[in-house]
């Protein structure tokens, strides 16, 4: 009887990354996606540890779909690929900033960004007036 080779280890996030993440009750972290050279905010997606690992190691962004309960790699169907330039964790560990080179539309509606045309009415502040407040 011949020996079977040991199964390949299941890849995981580096411990220092996994330990720093503060996940929601579903094990997910918000991922803000930004165009690397213009700083344009493109979209918000969700990642679990495996989606983040895939994003950090493949050069392409992978999200976890909350509605479909499955992984999806941006651009596999549409061709609108997000090429990873950097990933950063915020100070609280509960959000990621994924800087990308976006090919085509980022939004499933076909627009460049998911934040087109739905601005809300606000009272705009003035940073110059902050020193005048009493």
From Swiss-Prot:
Quaternary organization: Homodimer.
Name of the protein: Phosphoribosyl-AMP cyclohydrolase
Cofactor(s) essential for the protein: Mg(2+); Zn(2+)
PANTHER family registered for this protein in UniProt: HISTIDINE BIOSYNTHESIS BIFUNCTIONAL PROTEIN (PTHR42945), PHOSPHORIBOSYL-AMP CYCLOHYDROLASE (PTHR42945:SF11)
Superkingdom classification of source: Bacteria
Similarity annotation: Belongs to the PRA-CH family.
GO biological process: L-histidine biosynthetic process
Main subcellular location of this protein, as a coarse class: cytoplasm
Segment forming the signal sequence: none
Protein's cellular compartments: Cytoplasm
SUPFAM superfamilies for the chain: HisI-like
Binding site for Mg(2+): 90, 92, 94
Transmembrane segments: none
InterPro entries assigned to the protein according to its UniProt record, in alphabetical order: PRA-CH, PRib_AMP_CycHydrolase_dom, PRib_AMP_CycHydrolase_sf
Catalytic activity: 1-(5-phospho-beta-D-ribosyl)-5'-AMP + H2O = 1-(5-phospho-beta-D-ribosyl)-5-[(5-phospho-beta-D-ribosylamino)methylideneamino]imidazole-4-carboxamide
Nucleus in keyword set: no
GO MF assignments: magnesium ion binding; phosphoribosyl-AMP cyclohydrolase activity; zinc ion binding
Co-factor note (free text): Binds 1 Mg(2+) ion per subunit.
Database matches in Pfam families: PRA-CH
Summary of the function given for this chain in its UniProt record: Catalyzes the hydrolysis of the adenine ring of phosphoribosyl-AMP.
Pathway: Amino-acid biosynthesis; L-histidine biosynthesis; L-histidine from 5-phospho-alpha-D-ribose 1-diphosphate: step 3/9
Residues holding Zn(2+): 91, 107, 114
Record EC number: 3.5.4.19
Keywords associated with the record: Amino-acid biosynthesis, Cytoplasm, Histidine biosynthesis, Hydrolase, Magnesium, Metal-binding, Zinc
One GO cellular component term noted in the UniProt record for this chain: cytoplasm
């Amino acid at each position: 009887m011949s020996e079977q080779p040991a199964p390949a280890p299941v890849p995981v996030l580096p411990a220092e990354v996994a330990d720093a993440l503060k996940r929601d009750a579903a094990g997910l972290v918000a991922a803000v996606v930004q165009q690397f050279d213009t700083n344009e905010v493109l979209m918000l997606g969700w990642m679990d540890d495996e989606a983040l690992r895939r994003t950090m190691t493949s050069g392409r962004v992978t999200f976890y779909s909350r509605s479909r309960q499955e992984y999806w790699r941006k651009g596999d169907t549409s061709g609108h690929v997000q090429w990873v330039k950097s990933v950063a964790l915020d100070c609280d560990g509960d959000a990621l900033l994924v800087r990308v080179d976006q090919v085509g539309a980022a939004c499933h509606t076909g627009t460049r960004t998911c934040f087109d045309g739905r601005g809300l009415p606000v009272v705009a502040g003035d940073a110059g007036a902050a020193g005048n407040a009493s």
